[in-house]
């Protein structure tokens, strides 16, 4: 690395105002804070950055549409929520009109409704205008028959006769719930390889969540199988600090794939939104560095600044998020080394905030006991980032922060869905890609809330 492009820690602290990290925010309450992502002018329609790899032959938009967070609405014909198909159609139309051509879904996304909604929206466009990616998400029943049925149903739901990018979903666990049990022992991987030979799968790869051993196990098959791509969680926080959250650092994953010439797809460039909802003093300093860019744009520019990245997926529920990301990649302005170093040090500073690494992926849902797991964890994280977590009773603002935390908790999460209803069944732990011990965290948060409520009664 060019020493002239490096910034030392003292300069970084001056840039971020880290000395203010421990101070109490001026506003009481755990409401979202402003991130500067308002109207930023026109959205380019013909300036999208594309990536092409000889091994794939596809011209893919650097911004990919993650279909895990399609907007929903109450079911007018019954209970629960359904995908708002009209809004999905509008988002897909807008994305394609502005150069986005990669759409990533799964049989399990959005309560099992994502593939169908994505298929309906894309069917209205010429097939050559888009690339579709979906997954074998055979987590609970991974017999050959069940896996085959899931695969064939994806074609029906998506209304296609070939799939551009097909994933072995969420590899990384050693044993029966990993590569061996879900894909090797049952023979389904052999079937998928034949499907690739016959063209119904154009490219075959996998997404990674898990341990170093799990990653190396899947990668070791490359010489025999020739993986066409791999998707990893990569952002400036996980680049060197993922191991702090029981995951594998993204710099290692990226380099191992790159030296084997395996194209990389990125998921969680925003860490489930956490890198767009940073502590207030970090937000202000990022805005000082780039007043016209959103906080999220820093994370997307980082993700796109590496040559071996095919596409960066973002689950864009709202039009303004889609517009912001299109601006960032139309065209991409890559980060220089000094800017990357600034973000690496920002990530180190973020470690001072004891947040729970929930990315709101919803893999833990639905809870069999109705608990709103992501809602509880994200509320806690928001209060930490806003400096509104009640701490010592001796703090001057303790009563105000205590009241604000409890009021916002009850408003954010229905009482019947709060942490005290957790039975510790650990079903959620099996599917959490961040490897969070969810029952332990829920028990800890419940005890914390009960202590605050008891303090209220005690005066």
Region locations from a protein language model:
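N-terminal binding-site loop/beta-alpha segment at the start of enzyme catalytic domains
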Residues: 2-130, 161, 191, 197
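Residues that line or immediately flank small-molecule/substrate-binding pockets and catalytic motifs
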Residues: 67, 107-110, 167-170, 208, ...
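Glycine/proline-rich, positively charged
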Residues: 74, 141-265, 270, 278-282, ...
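Conserved, mostly hydrophobic/aromatic
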Residues: 53, 65, 103, 118, ...
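Hydrophobic faces of well-ordered beta-strands that scaffold small-molecule active sites
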Residues: 61-65, 103-105, 132-134, 166-168, ...
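Structured C-terminal cap/extension of enzyme domains
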Residues: 27, 226, 252-459
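Structural motif corresponding to the early beta-alpha repeats
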Residues: 109, 125-144, 148, 169-172
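Active-site mouth loops of central-metabolism enzymes
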Residues: 71-85, 136-144, 286-289
């Amino acid at each position: 690395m060019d020493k002239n492009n490096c910034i030392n820690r003292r300069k970084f602290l001056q840039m971020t105002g880290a000395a203010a990290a421990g101070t109490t925010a001026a506003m009481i309450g755990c409401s979202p804070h402003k991130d500067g992502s308002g109207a930023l002018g026109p959205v380019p329609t013909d300036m999208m950055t594309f990536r092409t790899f000889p091994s794939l032959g596809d011209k893919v938009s650097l911004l990919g549409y993650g279909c895990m967070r399609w907007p929903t609405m109450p079911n007018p014909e019954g209970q629960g929520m359904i995908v708002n198909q009209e809004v999905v159609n509008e988002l897909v139309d807008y994305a394609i009109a502005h150069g986005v051509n990669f759409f990533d879904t799964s049989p399990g996304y959005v309560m099992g409704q994502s593939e169908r909604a994505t298929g309906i929206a894309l069917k209205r466009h010429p097939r050559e205008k888009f690339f579709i990616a979906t997954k074998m998400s055979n987590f609970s029943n991974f017999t050959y028959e069940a896996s085959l049925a899931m695969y064939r149903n994806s074609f029906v739901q998506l209304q296609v006769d070939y799939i551009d990018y097909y994933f072995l979903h969420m590899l990384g666990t050693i044993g029966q719930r990993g590569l061996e049990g879900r894909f090797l022992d049952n023979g389904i991987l052999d079937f998928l390889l034949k499907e690739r030979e016959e063209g119904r799968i154009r490219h075959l790869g996998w997404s990674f969540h898990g341990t170093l051993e799990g990653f190396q196990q899947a990668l070791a098959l490359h010489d025999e199988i020739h993986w066409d791509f791999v998707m990893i969680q990569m952002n400036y926080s996980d680049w060197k600090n993922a191991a702090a959250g029981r995951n594998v650092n993204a710099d290692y994953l990226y380099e191992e794939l790159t030296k084997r010439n395996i194209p990389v797809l990125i998921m969680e460039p925003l860490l489930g939104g956490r890198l767009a909802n940073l502590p207030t003093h970090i937000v202000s300093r990022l805005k000082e560095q780039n007043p016209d860019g959103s906080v999220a744009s820093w994370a997307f520019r980082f993700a796109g600044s590496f040559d071996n990245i095919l596409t960066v997926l973002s689950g864009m529920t709202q039009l303004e998020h889609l517009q912001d990301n299109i601006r960032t990649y139309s065209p991409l302005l890559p980060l220089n080394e000094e800017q990357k170093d600034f973000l690496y040090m920002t990530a180190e500073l973020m470690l001072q905030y004891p947040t729970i690494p929930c990315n709101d992926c919803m893999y833990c849902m639905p809870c069999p006991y109705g608990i709103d797991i992501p809602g509880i964890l994200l509320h806690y994280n928001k209060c930490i980032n806003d400096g509104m977590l009640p701490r010592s009773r001796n703090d001057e603002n303790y009563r105000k922060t205590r009241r604000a935390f409890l009021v916002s908790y009850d408003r954010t999460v229905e009482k019947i869905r709060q942490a005290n209803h957790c039975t510790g069944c650990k079903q959620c732990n099996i599917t959490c890609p961040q490897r969070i011990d969810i029952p332990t965290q829920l028990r800890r948060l419940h005890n914390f809330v009960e202590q605050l409520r008891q303090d209220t009664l005690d005066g």
